[in-house]
């Protein structure tokens, strides 16, 4: 009998058999493809890409040719060698290796917390369950968006891309975070919260009556439709609100700053269900550990690929440790009966209580919420340095006519914040490395986008086309035939060229024997998958306030 613990559909974290054998998913640990992992680890046997024909039908009587045998050999040895190098570098064995990438630094952080009374701080500031639910509503990921005025239009000229160096680690070192339990507060205006935002963290529901962008030339609207708890007659731009009759959203003071810069509210706005907590910097033992992780990663550039890969994963995982949901569904599957069990029947509040009482819980969730908010604000500061802001993705901006003086001023402010906290630059191979600064990441002569995670560029130096399309491998750029005019809604990236595979799951009622004598049951088919490029819909600014609504006024003096 086999029991399978699943983190999401078709992605088991591990499989445990009654005879003691446990199968662990190395992909979740590596957080990259076997090809990339073997390259990063510089193992003897790299993945032999291109030697396997995925369209060929094989069974137990098929004779493998030399290329197929070589592919199988390299696939197996690459995985074994990558895993062994990881074990050796971490001083772990197959029993003690963490299941996931975030497990690598977790043990170190827990030991540091134990030595520095981190658990005591956690118990002092951890939120109750009701506040935790609100924090999860406030939390958002990275901001990814394109300029609606240039949808499906090829932009030509000198297009530069800037990105932040270790954006999230920088935010964890440079800014203040909620450092006490949240306390209830009366309804208030956004202006009141912004006036006190330096010393206090706020979470609240923002009520906006007739919100609208102040100017149509605001290129990146911030209000996210999917995070709104209520929206009436919203006109959206690829998931972001341009205007609406009414909107409600849980947010904090840092995100509020951007919202108030961009939107007017003809009918007024109000903050309700307000809670606040005093701010302070993250504990020194934690920020020192983050900074040392950055130093280690930087000093390993061009050195031992194994140690560099692990150091990079460690640095990138420190933020993720702060925003893991304390209560999440855990699915178990009995492979003999095929039955699933989910812990959704358990009381979420009770599960949260167990999480807070666990001695290994040392990093409060609210810290991670503010990390993404600070990074969100920094991204908009970076975007404001571009004369024309074309595209943004979490920690990078594509644009034209960059204001170099504003960029330099921003970078200088980043360095000052770090120096004020006692953290400087790292010198390696005659170069200076800083956390958080905006660095030139590429120059392009052409740019076109049809939506978030769907854009193509022409490199200014090489003249080659490159694409970023969620769900399409980078080699899909070949489909464009060196012409960005082909990058439009309705264009098909064919699976034969891109190498993208579609997973088709076949579920059988019983085990049966096929014509080749194979016992068959549930199976997965991999076949070439084409990708149809679509585009975001151009918005109609006149389509607003189409229906009569009745808005509850929470405070007559403010609304």
Where are these regions (language model features)?
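Conserved acidic
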Residues: 1-559
